[in-house]
Design a protein with these regions (language model features):
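Active-site-adjacent segment of SDR/Rossmann-fold oxidoreductases
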Residues: 13, 33, 54-64
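SDR active-site lid
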Residues: 57-123
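Non-catalytic terminal and boundary segments that flank Rossmann-like NAD(P)-dependent oxidoreductase
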Residues: 138-151
Length: 151
């Protein structure tokens, strides 16, 4: 796993020099919210988000901070390659959700400066999916522990 190799290589040096440092791991929104037909890809992205969360906790009292980038749809050449594989309606939806790569760069820079952990690039579509996932998890907890419900 590339990010783990990079961390193993550079983290000791970052800690040793003592200056403020920051690690940004690039995951995907698929590492936060599962999508259809992405079991292998999504699992690797979930693992990267989890590793980043643990790393952030491990480094909380050091000079190194951590972020995880979770873009959903970015307007890159990947989208143009989808044309042959998806319907026109799906492609239209993807294009409507796509954010400009410079927006992603701006979000990453802002997160580094503000030491923000989760970096999202779209506050509309991803917010809806994230809310649905969190609501489903909380609903399951409420069903399993009804006597402990907190309104």
């Amino acid at each position: 796993m590339g990010p783990l190799n990079g961390i193993n290589l550079f983290l000791p040096q970052m800690l040793e020099h003592g200056e403020a440092s920051h690690i940004v791991n690039t995951s995907s929104f698929s590492g936060i919210h599962g999508h259809g037909n992405q079991s292998a890809y999504g699992s690797s992205k979930f693992a990267l988000v989890g590793m980043s969360e643990f790393l952030r906790n491990d480094l909380k009292d050091t000079n190194v901070s951590v972020s995880v980038l979770c873009p959903h749809v970015v307007d890159t050449n990947i989208i143009s390659k989808l044309k042959a594989r998806v319907s026109a309606d799906v492609l239209k939806m993807i294009n409507q959700m796509a954010v400009d790569p410079s927006t992603v760069g701006d979000q990453v820079l802002k997160a580094i400066i503000e030491k923000e952990f989760y970096i999202f690039c779209d506050g509309v579509h991803t917010r809806e999916m994230l809310k649905a996932r969190c609501d489903a998890m909380l609903s399951a907890m409420d069903r399993q522990f009804p006597e402990e419900e907190n309104d």
